[in-house]
Each structure stands twice: as structure tokens, then as C-alpha cells.
Swiss-Prot record:
The modification N6-(pyridoxal phosphate)lysine is found at residue 244. InterPro entries: 4pyrrol_synth_NH2levulA_synth, Aminotrans_II_pyridoxalP_BS, Aminotransferase_I/II_large, AON_synthase_class-II, PyrdxlP-dep_Trfase, PyrdxlP-dep_Trfase_major, PyrdxlP-dep_Trfase_small. This is 5-aminolevulinate synthase. One of its GO terms (biological process) is protoporphyrinogen IX biosynthetic process. Pyridoxal 5'-phosphate binds at residues 185, 213, 241, 273-274.
């Protein structure tokens, strides 16, 4: 083993010893049988997929993508500046701007890139800018702010009082921006959006909201929590993804013409990469259009979320209580959490990926349950029964787990 192999091997061994080694599951998704998949030649039920509404297999979306594939081919042919600025992606951006009631939109290869390169670019455009960021913001937000090398203040999670204290400390005439998420993916809590908007206005700050876990799911047309609260027009930059509720891939920002154009001309994550293929852009556009017109998926989704939480209450299964569609079960032990996940998959045919550090803080390791409109009452009951049996086998005390979940909840909303 070479000198460098030893370094890498030690790094891997350390992660394994901490119980947070990640193994990919080889899955064969079944487009005609969502939310089922095949794993190790067995049919399983997926309970952790971010294809929130099953739009990846929706007939309109698949047929549109097939038509685009035959018409345009597989790839986009280049960057947006050199050959890759196709009609399909322009239509997608127009649809996104309309969704969020903004003047313009810009599409990126992923939600991560959209956050990372946009935030870093804002600091290039405004070198004196100050970032104010929620302490539990996504890694992509942290990466963008960090790489910007701009001055930053981190406010306590969801704590608008602390945010105001920090805003007060900076000259009101200095460029500043508050960056936050509408719904936090690991805990499921919503941000106090209107309070943040009011503070930003009071202290002359821009607002940047990450709506990746809410677009398509909330609001009359699927415009996210900002649309639900009727405040999209009061937020300067709305960022979202095409890879979750819309069932495709890609990320985007929406804002006014000048801001979007400035990012288009500045962001390396936009300029120096191949654009989304027309087949993806077309599929995303049709997915957005369908969810603008149809509320059926959202209604059914919320019904299943409620049924799942009610089932957990009946079975005395501890979970982190919130108002969103994300249902975390905090176990607090990386080894037991991984074992519970593997037992669900191998013994019960239920796939729930365990979430360990660094995705969540140590001591809050969890299973994160993601309901979809396609999950049935039987699937909910099977999951509940399996969890009770696995908790007993792993000596996970329900009372202790309940206390841990409540402790985490109180810490998050304190």
C-alpha cells in the first residue's frame, strides 16, 4: 500500500469506526409501479425518495421528454454561451419566472450549484456585501458564502430576534443579504418568512430564500411557502430545484431582470458548465405546468402525510413534530440508526436511508421518512409495525426516543 493509499485508508477507517460509513443501495426504480423499486432481486417500498409527488413517472412528463429526446437528441451541445442555449431551456426559465411572479429566471445544473455560485457571485458584484445566514442552512449555501470570502454573520436557527441583533450591528447603507430556507430538510421546520422579510426591509437588506423542499408542494400553483403566504413579491431572490417535487434535475434562481442578468454574466457555476439537455428542460417545464393546474397531487400528498403521522401516534413511534411533509425519527445513535435502516430494507422490504453526521449533528442521527401521494394505508401500517419491532429488537426505548425528539424540537424552535 502506497503512502497516499494509507492516508485514504485511515480516513475511511475513521469514518467506519464512527458508524457513519455510507454505502450506496443498488436500486431499480419502477416507473410503472411507484413508489416500488427492486433491490437485491426483491421488490421494496421506498420511503425516503425526494421525488415527492412521483412526477418523474407522470405520463405528461415522460411523454414530453420522449418527444424532446427524439426531436433534439440527448445532450445540449455546450454551455449556455456556446451552443447550449436551446429553446427548451428558455421556455423553462420563462415558466419558472411566471411560477414565482418574477421578471426573470436562470437555470443551473443543480440546486447546489444554484446556491453556491449565485451567493459567491453576489460578493463579486457587491464586494462590500455582508451575509446573514441561518445556522442550519444547507451545505450549498454555506459553500457559496464561504467561497465568497465576504463578511458573514450566522444567526441562531429560526431566531429572528438574534437576526435583528446582528443586522443592527452593520451600517444600514452597506449591502447585505439574509439567506434562509423555507423548510429545513432534516427537521422539517418552516422559517418565519414574513418576520424575516420585515427585518430585511427595516435594515435595507436583500432576501434570498431556498425553496427546494417546498416548490411544487405548497401554494396554489406550487410556488412554495412564499406563494402560500402570498409574499413571493416581497422576496428578492427565490431559489429552487427541479429535482424534487418536479421529478427531474437542475436548480434555478428567480428575481428581477437586472439581478438575474448580473448573475448570468458573473457566476462561474453557470458560465463554465454544459447546460441542461433539452430533454430535461422540456420534462421540467411540463411538470411545472401540470402542478400549476392540478392541485390533486398536493391534496393527496398532505392526506398521506397526516395519515402517516397519525399512525406513528397510534403506535407510539417517536418523531420530530413539525408542520411539514418531512417526518424525522431521531434515534441519536449512529450504529443503531444504521442497523434500523438495514433491517427495514433486508427484513421488511422497506427502504429508509439513515441520516448521520455530517448531514445532521452528532447525537441526532435519524431516519427521515418521506411520504408521497402513492403510499397506501397498508404501506403506512407495514412501516409502523416494522419500526416498533425493530426498535424492540435494537433496545431503542420508545420513551427515551420520544424525549430526545422533543428535546431536539425545543432546541430548534427556542
Amino acid at each position: 500500500m502506497s503512502y497516499y493509499d494509507i492516508i485514504f485508508s485511515k480516513h475511511i477507517d475513521k469514518i467506519k469506526s464512527e458508524g457513519r460509513y455510507r454505502e450506496f443501495k443498488a436500486l431499480k426504480r419502477q416507473a410503472d409501479n411507484f413508489p416500488f423499486a427492486e433491490h437485491a432481486n426483491k421488490q421494496i417500498v421506498m420511503w425516503c425518495i425526494n421525488d415527492y409527488l412521483g412526477m418523474s413517472k407522470h405520463a405528461k412528463v415522460m411523454h414530453a421528454s420522449i418527444d424532446a429526446l427524439l426531436k433534439y437528441g440527448v445532450g445540449s451541445g455546450g454551455t449556455r454561451n456556446i451552443g447550449g442555449n436551446n429553446i427548451a431551456i428558455l421556455e423553462l426559465e420563462k415558466e419558472l419566472a411566471n411560477l414565482h411572479k418574477k421578471q426573470a429566471a436562470l437555470v443551473f445544473t443543480s440546486g447546489f450549484v444554484a446556491n453556491d455560485t449565485t451567493l459567491a457571485s453576489l460578493a463579486k458584484i457587491m464586494p462590500d456585501i455582508v451575509f446573514f445566514s441561518d445556522e442550519l442552512n444547507h451545505a450549498s449555501i454555506i459553500a457559496g458564502i464561504t467561497s465568497s470570502r465576504a463578511e458573514k454573520y450566522i444567526y441562531r436557527h429560526l431566531d429572528v430576534k438574534h437576526l435583528e441583533e446582528l443586522l443592527q450591528s452593520v451600517d444600514i447603507n452597506r449591502p447585505k443579504i439574509v439567506v434562509f430556507e423555507s423548510a429545513y430538510s432534516m427537521d422539517g421546520f418552516f422559517s418565519p418568512i414574513k418576520d424575516i422579510i420585515n427585518l430585511a426591509k427595516k435594515y435595507n437588506a436583500l432576501t434570498f430564500i431556498d425553496e427546494v423542499h417546498t416548490v411544487g408542494l405548497y401554494g396554489k400553483q406550487g410556488g412554495g411557502i412564499a406563494e402560500l403566504l402570498n409574499c413571493s413579491d416581497q422576496i428578492d431572490i427565490i431559489q429552487g430545484t427541479l429535482a424534487k417535487a418536479y421529478g427531474t434535475i437542475g436548480g434555478y434562481i428567480t428575481s428581477n431582470h437586472n439581478l438575474v442578468d448580473a448573475i448570468r454574466l458573473t457566476a462561474p457555476g453557470f458560465i463554465f458548465t454544459t447546460s441542461l439537455p433539452p430533454v430535461i428542460s422540456t420534462a421540467a417545464t411540463h411538470s411545472i405546468r401540470h402542478l400549476k393546474e392540478s392541485n390533486e397531487e398536493r391534496i393527496k400528498h398532505q392526506e398521506v402525510v397526516t395519515k402517516l403521522k397519525n399512525s406513528f401516534e397510534r403506535f407510539n413511534i417517536p418523531y420530530l413534530k413539525n408542520e411539514s411533509h418531512i417526518v424525522p425519527i431521531i434515534i441519536g445513535d449512529p450504529i443503531k440508526t444504521a442497523k434500523a435502516s438495514n433491517m427495514l430494507l433486508n427484513e421488511y422490504g422497506i427502504y429508509v436511508q439513515h441520516i448521520n453526521f455530517p448531514t445532521v449533528p452528532r447525537g441526532t442521527e435519524r431516519l427521515r421518512i418521506i411520504p408521497t401521494p402513492a403510499h397506501t394505508d397498508k404501506m403506512i401500517n407495514d412501516l409502523s409495525v416494522a419500526l416498533v419491532q425493530i426498535f424492540a429488537e435494537l433496545d431503542i426505548e420508545l420513551s427515551s426516543a420520544k424525549e430526545l425528539n422533543e428535546e431536539v424540537r425545543l432546541n430548534l424552535i427556542a
